[in-house]
Amino acid sequence: MTKKSDAPAIRFKGFSDTWEQRKFEEIAVRSSVICSDDTLPRVEYEDIVSGTGRLNKDIYAKQSSKSGIVFHQGDVLYGKLRPYLQNWLLPTFDGLAVGDFWVLQPQNADSSFLYRLIQSRQFDEVANQSTGTKMPRADWKLVSKTVFSIPSNISEQAAIGTYFTALDSLITLHQRKPFLMKWRTSDANRNQTNRLVL
């Protein structure tokens, strides 16, 4: 169901191709290969900083023999349990997704763009029309049939994904600045105190 769509008013220089209306299932497919290979790192809900797509620990240091869905670098992990928690990850390594994850493999789409698409307001609204009350889960039947407007040119998708990745890195850097300044100040004070004691 690929239909042409109006392109947004603001575009990256050099791109003039049309955008398309495509169902999510035409952009990504779910992997469901289960494995318990002890050599692969495991990613669980508790390992992801909610809403940031960052890991909060060295997952290679974890000891686990749990089974999980195999993912590869370039796949996108989406936490379908309680989707409002925004547990997502664009891994730069191969591993196992343990728990209620969708492992999404891009289809005629750039993985960084797909990663940004699952963070969009439209995707979030659809995913949060979930099933279950105590443990709500995103409904694949609903999400997979939802139509999204995407660039037909994969290079433009990659440019959009790269832009937002750089923006996230810049935001993270600025959020860490006060912490680093405080750390440097306390370290300088500690060094000054040590000099006085000697």
Indicate where each model-derived feature is located.
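Feature detects amphipathic, helix-rich regulatory segments
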Residues: M1-L198
